[in-house]
């Protein structure tokens, strides 16, 4: 976690709170999520973990698939996207828009890290498959039946010069550095134009 950090899809705030408690040198953390409740709970968790004097916390209600509501010059030393992509509706190509919108806000020497649960191309036992079907079809808490490593790698490589990704079980972990300077070319079509 860098001095200035952006956490997207904050969930319960477990990861930033754990990093700060372990001694991360972060002095400013920006939390971005669609849920004001998640943002409030995460901010509270962080402040209870390290104290208001240790880190400045900013909260932003916004979509990770739209241009981020920051000045173009705003850069973060690190950006995290933990266990978010598999919860986002849309195709893998549409989800890769996230990499397009975070790239301009990652410092030249910064790092993007993340994880997601894949729906294709990874081994899964019958119980895991049953749970995945339930999460995707019954509870609608997952939207990852088409998600695969190759397409996420492509989206990352389109935006970053250095990409490292690997699989642990059914989870893809990734790390990306050196944001490309030119605008990323994306094949994402806005949902309004799908007819």
From Swiss-Prot:
A single GO molecular function term of this UniProt record: methyltransferase activity
Protein species of origin: Aspergillus niger (strain ATCC 1015 / CBS 113.46 / FGSC A1144 / LSHB Ac4 / NCTC 3858a / NRRL 328 / USDA 3528.7)
Enzyme class: transferase
Pathway(s) where this gene product acts: Secondary metabolite biosynthesis
GO biological process per UniProt: methylation
InterPro entries: Methyltransf_12, SAM-dependent_MTases_sf
Protein name, as recorded: O-methyltransferase
EC number: 2.1.1.-
Lineage: Eukaryota, Fungi, Dikarya, Ascomycota, Pezizomycotina
Function: O-methyltransferase; part of the gene cluster that mediates the biosynthesis of pyrophen and campyrone B, which represent a class of fungal amino acid-derived alpha-pyrone natural products. The first step of pyrophen biosynthesis is catalyzed by the PKS-NRPS hybrid synthetase ATPKS that uptakes and condensates L-phenylalanine and malonyl-CoA in order to produce desmethyldesacetylpyrophen.
């Amino acid at each position: 976690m860098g001095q200035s950090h952006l956490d997207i899809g904050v969930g319960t705030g477990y990861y930033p709170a754990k990093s700060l408690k372990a001694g991360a040198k972060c002095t400013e953390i920006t939390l971005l999520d669609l849920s004001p409740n998640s943002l409030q709970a995460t901010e509270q968790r962080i402040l209870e973990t390290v104290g208001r004097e240790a880190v400045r916390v900013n909260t932003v209600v916004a979509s990770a698939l739209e241009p981020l509501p920051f000045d173009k010059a705003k850069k973060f030393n690190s950006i995290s996207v933990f266990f978010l992509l598999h919860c986002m509706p849309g195709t893998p190509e549409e989800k890769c828009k996230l990499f397009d919108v975070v790239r301009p806000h990652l410092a030249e020497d910064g790092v993007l890290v993340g994880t997601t649960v894949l729906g294709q191309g990874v081994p899964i036992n019958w119980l895991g498959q049953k749970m995945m079907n339930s999460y995707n079809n019954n509870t609608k808490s997952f939207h990852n039946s088409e998600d695969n490593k190759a397409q996420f790698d492509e989206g990352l490589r389109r935006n970053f010069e250095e990409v490292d990704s690997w699989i642990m079980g059914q989870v893809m972990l990734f790390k990306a550095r050196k944001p490309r300077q030119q605008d990323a070319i994306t094949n994402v079509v806005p949902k309004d134009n799908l007819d």
